[in-house]
């Protein structure tokens, strides 16, 4: 593992603190009028999801976490979890439901996901930032709905995600959804 100095701290950098992998969410460089400069960072634990704050004196160094990202295609889901396959090596990886709870509504077969591995074990699965999903159910848009100021209505996608869509979107239509926020982006033309 490589050691990085506090001057190299950046948002998104993966470091190891007390033997645990962390992701830097926020990095503030503070240079007080008196005393030594320091970095105050906010980090998220990859294994537990817990967010903590740490302070490092300027010039200190920490080790980078042994984290590897692999792009893999979702083959299928079953009672145990989801099975992903690397398109180049055809190697398969089974990820159990405990690690998929926060992205369960974004699981769609034959879609490429990013598997985050720490010391060879899957610690997280990241969906693509944008996904094209079909609307499974939504209330029909009624003429005059916009007069009340309501331009969005609830909808459920084919993956089970609950999103808000414009009133002109009907069941069966393809929409582009931002998986980070769960928000509607645009209608997809066929």
Swiss-Prot record:
Superkingdom classification of source: Bacteria
Pfam families the UniProt entry points to: EFP (PF01132), EFP_N (PF08207), Elong-fact-P_C (PF09285)
Localization in the cell: Cytoplasm
Pathway: Protein biosynthesis; polypeptide chain elongation
KW Cell wall biogenesis/degradation (keyword) present: no
Keyword Cytoplasm listed: yes
Keyword terms, alphabetized: Cytoplasm, Elongation factor, Protein biosynthesis
GO biological process: peptide biosynthetic process
InterPro entries: Elong-fact-P_C, NA-bd_OB-fold, Rib_uL2_dom2, Transl_elong_fac_P/YeiP, Transl_elong_KOW-like, Transl_elong_P/YeiP_cen, Transl_elong_P/YeiP_CS, Transl_elongation_fac_P
Molecular function, one GO term: translation elongation factor activity
Any single GO CC term annotated in Swiss-Prot or TrEMBL for this entry: cytoplasm
Function: Involved in peptide bond synthesis. Stimulates efficient translation and peptide-bond synthesis on native or reconstituted 70S ribosomes in vitro. Probably functions indirectly by altering the affinity of the ribosome for aminoacyl-tRNA, thus increasing their reactivity as acceptors for peptidyl transferase.
Similarity comment: Belongs to the elongation factor P family.
Name by which UniProt lists this protein: Elongation factor P 2
Organism: Chlamydia pneumoniae (Chlamydophila pneumoniae)
């Amino acid at each position: 593992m490589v050691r990085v100095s506090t001057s190299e701290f950046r948002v998104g950098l993966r470091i190891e603190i007390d033997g645990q992998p962390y992701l830097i969410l926020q990095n503030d460089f503070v240079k007080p009028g008196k005393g030594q400069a320091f970095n105050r960072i906010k980090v998220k634990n990859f294994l537990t999801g817990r967010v903590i704050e740490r302070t490092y004196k300027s010039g200190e160094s920490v080790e980078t976490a042994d984290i590897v990202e692999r792009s893999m295609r979702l083959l299928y889901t079953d009672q145990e979890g989801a099975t992903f396959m690397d398109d180049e090596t055809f190697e398969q990886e089974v990820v159990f439901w405990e690690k998929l709870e926060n992205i369960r509504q974004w699981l769609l077969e034959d879609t490429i996901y990013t598997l985050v591995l720490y010391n060879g074990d899957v610690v997280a699965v990241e969906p693509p930032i944008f996904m094209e999903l079909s609307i499974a159910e939504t209330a029909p848009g009624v003429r005059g709905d916009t007069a009340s100021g309501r331009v969005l209505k609830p909808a459920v996608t084919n993956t089970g995600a609950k999103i808000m869509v414009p009133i002109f979107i009907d069941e069966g239509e393809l929409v582009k959804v931002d998986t980070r926020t769960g928000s509607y982006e645009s209608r997809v033309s066929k």
